[in-house]
Every structure is written in C-alpha cells, then in structure tokens.
Amino acid sequence: MTYTKDALKEAIQQKLRLNYGCTEKQATDGEIMKACALALRDIMAVRSVDTQERTQEQQEKRVHYMSLEFLMGRSLMKNAYNLGILPQLTQAVEELGFSAPDIFDMEPDAGLGNGGLGRLAACYLDSMTTLDIPATGYSICYELGIFKQKIVDGQQVELPDDWLNLGDAWLMPKPQEAEEIHFGGRVRTRWDNGHLMVVHEDYTRVLAIPCDMLVAGYNTDHVNTLRLWDAKSPKPIDMQLFSQGQYLKANEERAMADSISTILYPEDNHYEGKSLRLKQQYFFVSATLQSITRQHIQTYGTLKNFHEKNVIQINDTHPALVIPELMRILIDDAGLGWDEAWDITRHSVAYTNHTVLAEALESWPQRLFETLLPRIWQIMQEIARRWQQKVDNFYHDPKKTEKMAVIWDGVVHMANLCIAGGMAVNGVSALHSDILRRDVFRDACGMEPDKFRNVTNGVDHRRWISQINPGLDGLIRDCIGDGYLTHAGHLSDLDRFADDAAVLSRLEQIKGDNKQAFARWAKRQQGVTLNTDAIFNVQVKRLHEYKRQLLNVLHIISLYQQLQDDPNMDFRPQTFLFGAKAAPGYAVAKRIIRLINSLADQINSDPICRDKLQVVFLENYRVSMAEMLMPASEVSQQISTAGKEAS
C-alpha cells in the first residue's frame, strides 16, 4: 500500500483529535511528534499482524535476540525511512504548519542502552527485519534509561533520563500477556514414580508486563518486534498501613518491584546493587522464556521440538540465566528428564562474547543465588557438577577444571555457564574470536573446538550512511546506484573512483557541509563555537581506562606544549571532540572527564591556540548526537589497549 502525503496528514490529524483532544493549530511540538509516531505505528501494526500470521502458518524457525541493551536511538525518521515514506511524512508535517526538523528533533533517544553492545543489538534487529527473518528482540523497559549526563564545573553529574515522557508513543502495552516471576522463598522436592516433583513456595511475585516496540524493515512489509518488560507488583497497596499514615511502608513491595525496571545497570559496588542487578537479569530472562515457550506450546503442543523451531541468541552474559531457566521450564513445568532437557537447551542457546578483559567476565556470589533464586541455584549446581566431571574426564588437570568451572569457591562464572550450556560461542571480530580461542577460552576451545566461531560485527549502513548523510548517499547512488542499500558489498565498487578528481571534489564538499551542519548543531545545543576549518578529530565511546581517552589527552597536551614552545610552527589546525559517559561508580573515569574539561578550558582560552587547537567535550553523548557527528568526523580515534578491544 502506498501512503501519500495527504493520507499521512489526515492520519496525524486524526491522532491529534483522538489521542490528545486537539487540532494541529492547538498542538504542541511534542504532541505532533507523538501523533506522527502513532500514525506510523498503525501502519506497522497492520504489517506486524500479517508477519506473525505468515510465520505461524509456515511454522518458520524463530530468532529470539536477548540483550540487556538495545541502543535504538530515535525511531520516527528511521521507521519512516524504512517504510519509504520519509519525504511524504516531512511534507505532511510542514503542511500542518510545523518544522519537520524540529519535530524529528523532539523525539528523545530511547533509554534502552549505553554502548556498542546495545548498538549492535539494534543493528541486528534492523537487519533481520529487512531480511524477512522472524525475529524478536527482548529487553527491559527502563523507565529512566542509564542516565542523562550533565557537565557541571567540568565534572559529570548523572540526571534521570525521562525518555518515556515522549518516547512511549512507540510502545504497545500488552498486560494480557504478562508473566509472573518468582524471587526468594524455598524449594521442596520429592520423587514420584521416577519423576522429580518440585514445589517452590513462600516466594515474592513480580509481574512482567510486555511493552512491544515495532521495528520496520527496509523495503519490505516484514515487521519484527522488540519486546520490553516492565516490572510491577501484583499486590495492591496496603490500605491498612496507608490509613495509619505509614505511606512508604504501604508502598514498599510495589516500589521494590518497580525498581527492577527503573534504570539500566544500577550501581553494584554494594550488596543491594548486586541484588538488584541479578533480579533484573532473572526477571528479564524468566519473562522472556515463559513467553517464548508459551507461544511454542500454543503452536506445536509440546516443547520436545523447541530447539528445532527456536534459537536464542544471548548478547553477552547478562541473559546467561536463560540456560538454567529453560532447564527449569523443561523439567519442572514440562516434566522432561534431565538428559532430554539438557539436549534441547544445548541446541537452543548461542552466546556472543563482547570482552577479553578477565575482570569484565561476569561473576556472582553464590549466596545471592541461594537467597534470590533457590530453584535456579539447584539447577546451576547440577549443571556445574556435570560440566566439571566432563572437564575432569577430558583434561585430568585440576587447574583447567578450576578455570573452566561454572561454580568455584562460592563464585558463579557466567561466561563458563554460557560455554557449558550453549551450542555456539562467537566473538565479534576475527581478531577477537582468535583471542578467545587462543587465550580467554583456550581450554574450553581445546575440548569443544567446533563450538567456537567468529561473527564479525556489522552496522546498519542504511541508517549510518543513507539516512543521516544524504549528501554522501546521493554521491554513492550517482556512482554505483542504490543496490548498496540492500547489498553492502556493492560499496567496494567505489574503489574505481579513488582517483576521480570530480568525485573527490564532491566528497570534500559533502564533508565540509556536514562539518558546518554539526557546528551549527553544537552551537545551538551546547553553546560551543567549533572551528570548521580544523580537522575534526573524534573520540566518542564509553569512558574506560582501556579505551585510552587518557592517551588521547596526553597527545593533545604534547601538541599544546609544542605550540607554546613555537607559536609560529607549521601546524595543521585540529579540533578534538570527546563524547563519553562514565559509569556512576567509576571514579577514575570521572576524573578523566574532569581532566578533559580542564584541558579544554586551558587550551580554548589560550590566544596561542586560537584557530589552531581546540578541545571540546560533548555533553550527554547518544545515538542522535552520533548521527550528526559521524558525517562530520574526519579522524576517528580507535586507540584501545592492544588485545583488549573486542572489535
């Protein structure tokens, strides 16, 4: 179906009247933005139903991509672009009396991620949808995202990121599909005719309410879903305590449940923080698996063929509890024996590793599992015992047994759990995968070499070239056509233009225009004036010592000293742009941010450096900022410690 400008305009007007009780003459920019989102959501909802019916009829294998992060950025322009109606939507908004760029800029970045882990998940979801693969992403509906970064006196201050205020237009709550999650309590077991009967009692219940975000594929009617779980207590407020004036205590259980889906990565340098993180992970995993298995049983009537019709890809170790949770469902709920359940599990789950840093490989204290997840702990113990026996029989080496253990000395090792219970382990670049085989997981690879493979990180090039850089997109189309939009390999055809003076001149003009556009954005958003005649030298990524922002700072200090020693030296002007968030509890990273801002104050106020050297820290780096910055960048600093970066 073709959606014209007039049809979209009428749809937006209808949404304003029905949802916000106003006309375009009375509407705010925010209401127009949400009305546009709702109009597009309706288009995608129709296609989503068709996609689900087609998948159900053809009984296709489904991909379930589980990640604590999905760094989606903004969805309005992206979905309009993929649906092929961005020009029509732009015209419709303009004819309603609004500035389309201002309306698009109203949309907040979805607060569902932080770094490369989440951006990879978002790119995969876009790609799978474009390829017509039946896929669903799963995560948590974080109320306040990770945090909004504010720089005050050169230092990072964390503020709540209330993205749902405007971003909730994309979400479709489905309370009728809620799942119940159990924490704490105690477990009783008994044998009955050769079957283990498990009773979990005295637990705390939390409801997981699904909120679905639809994802449109490019140039296809296929629509996939990102299912986000919102945590709520099933217990009403304690009216007796409330009437006694004990307002906080009356709401205590509701507040504890709500905290599970409040923020991404709560600080975990104390017991309560660790407990909340583990609750988040199990809440997310249990809700997802209950939903997947329920849908599978409705279709096939059994879980015995679960692995034939489903694959669960876990993005890093945060969803690793999918392994014991699937075992719990297969054994306790479906009544399967251990061996059959383990065979199904091991052929259903695949694990993507994202780090080679030993200290970053996730682990948990045993006592947390015993307290919060008693039944999962029982299953984990049996997984660990059987895996350890397998390693012992293969290596006969106590040191290797300890290194590969799922549980050792009161600590649960999640990466080892993923290796033990998964059918595949992949790195995200050839070098990274090689390091995993030769070093990080060398012993596991020696025992099960076929399990380890490489899947090099990709990027949604339609977003990062065509959508955000229309000048470059136009040049590419003029040179090689638009086939690259669905077949990125066609970009290699540009090699033949490497020495084409006309193409290079046009490329230089496009870069200059993008730099000017970013400079205007930076002036408007952050009040900083950039020297667009200088090289834009950019380092934007999570703030971490191994990312070596500090090394970049030392290089800048060296350049500054050279200019001080010889102000008239031959010097190519450079503007160094930093963008990074530091984890709230990461003191060293925060001090590096302060150092960058102090250095910026010193250099930018020194007359010697005028029009030669500039340093700018970009506050609250996010996907929508990257969409402005990437087309303007000329040098991208990728200087992580050798052998420590996954990709």
Named regions from a protein language model:
Residues 1-647:
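A conserved ligand/cofactor-binding region detector
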